[in-house]
């Protein structure tokens, strides 16, 4: 619907969604502020409503209602076909891989226990290195899948924008039909019916009495037709926030996926790289200490001095750059981010089911109204 220049960017449905406090009467009131172009359409449609033309009245606005019905079908199909299940599978896979590497395995104290029990510390360290490399490769593949899911969600968001604009167009079209019918109803009630009643009263002619009665019946049917169109418009009013609800859930999910790809995964890789570097440093220090101890055994005369130097060197080298507890906290934050994303997905799935149920009810109501129209005919 065209609007005046000072309100061209303000649509009743947008106001309804943004303010949340607007009720239906406020929306209908704002929609009555038609532009000059819309008023011309209203006048034209109003003149096309011919008194006593029951067939014409029956078909009045049916094209707009049919478009609204087809639009409701499309919305329902989009809700049914939009499947974010693979997104959840990918996120679950990512969480599983992140949890598969335990920072405690990089703790030197645990490595000492392994040495005492299995006598194979070197093999255990190599296994950890290999495991982390394998997990890193798998996370890269999951990252590619998540990026694809994010792009699909963005396409769905754009598609929902188009549907939202279409819904506004249907709302505007129905508002024009309703306004034109109300205008015609007012003219008949205030002008035509009083004239026919006066004529019947003055002439006493039964045909004139019947003509007045027929006109009153026509106005009553016109009022019912207006109500049917208002029901269709109500669908558009209720569909707008439902579209935005689905769209906002998809947007939040896409943002969480992007956060995982651009922040969580690189951070995990960096922290694991640091941990591996520290592990190698600790191994180098251990080797250095062993050489120093052997030298101390061979150089008895300088044993005390060498012992002091070796202990001082070992103490300095044993100091870690990054605490294991810090690494555990970082990984915990990453996992919490993924879990929040899964919660958003579950919330989105619930909202879509709710939207699907409501849309089915609205579609059934509209079909019942159309059937009633046909039966009344």
Curated annotation (Swiss-Prot):
InterPro entries: Toxic_anion-R_TelA. Residues 20-34 have a biased composition (Polar residues). Residues 1-39 are annotated as: Disordered. Residues 1-18 have a biased composition (Basic and acidic residues). Disulfide bonds: none annotated. Pfam families: TelA. Belongs to the TelA family. This is TelA-like protein SSP1345. It comes from Staphylococcus saprophyticus subsp. saprophyticus (strain ATCC 15305 / DSM 20229 / NCIMB 8711 / NCTC 7292 / S-41).
